[in-house]
């Protein structure tokens, strides 16, 4: 195989590989001879089929295989010799593919962008600040009160009392669209908490002020994106009878409440709440610390970036943000989404940090264990209740999906590795100050 360089600009590489016709013919003959002892053909004993007949019968297929193997081997040898690591799969094209015939040399072009050499990052001088929040008694009490509210019961209000937001009303209702009842549009003794927004918009608001015994005609319009297409956008009337109006009664904050939530006592429940709150604060603090570290690394090291990686990342960012702004659109049945300059700037940062962290992780021999991958798959599978097995099979058969799960685990382990060697000071802050620091992350 002859190799000629055609491009070497920045990270872009181009080569022309030529496989002489004689070499290809020799490889085809060698493959046919290797297969000859096992070939059976009518009119011949096993292993006695003439080479000429074998070539006529199998030559084209064998030639295609030999051609592909030769090109693949030449590319592997070239990459090993040059030390290049392609950023993406090299683009391989046959120059004379349309006119090529047996006896001609095989000429292919190979083009790719090489990953850049990553300069050494001096991590010894990295200084970071970890925000520390301790759960206060007020925060624990507030969490307890929320638990008590969630465990609340309802008691009948005095006869004639008007219902207000937060009250529970017990109703019978019958819905009509175009004068006809529809499936799922009626119920009896239905408990509805006003203000819970569990019914379609406008329904609950019209029952505020109703009293037990009142009959109310509730007029609403189903949302355009309503889950039942036959009702979407339709006007509806619900004939509603209010049978009871009940006031919320928060549960007592005592040992009985604690037992409802699996704790042995109120003190034990308080301890669990404190641990949960501080775990949440630590998680949020880590986000701030990680962003600070990534900002430092981004400023610390500069190197050329493969345009193909930046372009792919920018398109992915643009696509993701577009879908976040258009949640009603599913799939990819939309026009081309062009990345903006902001998308490209963010893509450059992500690619640069991704390559740098990969280099640091490789030198530190950081890997993602099978156990860590299994835990990640389990966490993701919980988002698809009833379809866990199908999700597992999808991950097993999809290397790209595996990499999408592995990448953030690897990144976090590399970040932890850097933080362990950095000078980290702790700064006590309030919950509000931590929340402001988190909000600032979203604005960057």
From Swiss-Prot:
Enzyme class, UniProt record, top EC level: isomerase
PROSITE patterns registered for this protein in UniProt: FKBP_PPIASE
UniProt-listed InterPro entries: PPIase_dom_sf (IPR046357), PPIase_FKBP_dom (IPR001179), Trig_fac (IPR005215), Trigger_fac_C (IPR008880), Trigger_fac_C_sf (IPR037041), Trigger_fac_ribosome-bd_bac (IPR008881), Trigger_fac_ribosome-bd_sf (IPR036611), Trigger_fact/SurA_dom_sf (IPR027304)
Pfam families per UniProt: FKBP_C, Trigger_C, Trigger_N
Main location group: cytoplasm
Enzyme Commission designation: 5.2.1.8
Subcellular location: Cytoplasm
All residue ranges annotated as the PPIase FKBP-type domain in the record: 166-251
Molecular-function GO terms, alphabetical: peptidyl-prolyl cis-trans isomerase activity
Catalytic activity, reaction form: [protein]-peptidylproline (omega=180) = [protein]-peptidylproline (omega=0)
Protein's GO biological process: cell division; protein folding; protein transport
Domain of life: Bacteria
GO cellular component terms, semicolon-separated: cytoplasm
Keyword list, A-Z: Cell cycle, Cell division, Chaperone, Cytoplasm, Isomerase, Rotamase
Similarity-based family: Belongs to the FKBP-type PPIase family. Tig subfamily.
Classification via NCBIfam families: tig
Domain notes: Consists of 3 domains; the N-terminus binds the ribosome, the middle domain has PPIase activity, while the C-terminus has intrinsic chaperone activity on its own.
Function in brief: Involved in protein export. Acts as a chaperone by maintaining the newly synthesized protein in an open conformation. Functions as a peptidyl-prolyl cis-trans isomerase.
Protein name in the entry: Trigger factor
């Amino acid at each position: 195989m002859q190799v000629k360089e055609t491009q070497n600009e920045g990270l872009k590489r181009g080569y022309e590989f030529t496989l002489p016709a004689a070499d290809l013919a020799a490889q085809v003959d060698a493959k046919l001879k290797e297969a000859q002892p096992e070939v059976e053909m009518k009119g011949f004993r096993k292993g006695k089929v003439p080479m000429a007949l074998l070539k006529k019968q199998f030559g084209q297929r064998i030639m295609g295989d030999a051609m592909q193997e030769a090109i693949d081997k030449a590319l592997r040898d070239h990459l090993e010799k040059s030390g290049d690591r392609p950023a993406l799969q090299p683009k391989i094209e046959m120059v004379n593919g349309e006119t090529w015939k047996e006896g001609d040399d095989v000429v292919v072009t190979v083009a790719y962008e090489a990953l850049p050499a990553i300069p050494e990052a001096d991590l010894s001088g990295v200084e970071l600040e970890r925000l520390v929040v301790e759960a206060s008694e007020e925060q624990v009490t507030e969490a307890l009160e929320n638990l008590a509210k969630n465990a609340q019961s309802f008691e009948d209000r005095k006869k004639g009392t008007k219902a207000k937001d937060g009250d529970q009303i017990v109703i019978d209702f019958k819905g009509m669209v175009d004068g006809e009842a529809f499936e799922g549009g009626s119920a009896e003794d239905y408990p509805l908490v006003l203000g819970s927004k569990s019914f379609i918009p406008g329904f609950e608001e019209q029952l505020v002020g109703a009293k037990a015994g009142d009959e109310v005609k509730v007029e609403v319009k189903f949302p355009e994106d309503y889950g039942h297409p036959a009702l979407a956008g339709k006007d509806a009337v619900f004939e509603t009878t209010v049978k009871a109006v009940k006031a919320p009664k928060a549960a007592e904050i005592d040992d009985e409440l604690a037992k409802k939530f699996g704790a042995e006592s109120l003190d034990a429940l308080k301890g669990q709440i404190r641990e949960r709150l501080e775990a949440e604060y630590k998680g949020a603090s880590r986000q701030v610390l990680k962003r600070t570290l990534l900002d430092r690394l981004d400023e610390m090291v500069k190197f050329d970036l493969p345009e193909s990686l930046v372009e792919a990342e920018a398109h992915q960012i643009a696509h993701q943000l577009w879908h976040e702004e258009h949640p009603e659109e599913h799939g990819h049945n939309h026009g081309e989404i062009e990345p903006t300059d902001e998308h490209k700037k963010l893509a450059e940062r992500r690619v640069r940090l991704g390559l740098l962290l990969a280099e640091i992780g490789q030198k530190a021999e950081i890997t993602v264990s099978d156990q860590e991958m299994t835990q990640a798959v389990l966490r993701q599978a919980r988002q698809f209740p009833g379809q866990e097995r199908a999700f597992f099979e999808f991950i097993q058969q999809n290397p790209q999906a595996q990499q999408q799960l592995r990448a953030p685990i690897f990144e976090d382990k590399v970040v932890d590795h850097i933080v362990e060697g950095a000078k980290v000071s702790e700064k006590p802050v309030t919950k509000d100050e931590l929340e402001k620091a988190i909000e600032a992350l979203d604005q960057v």
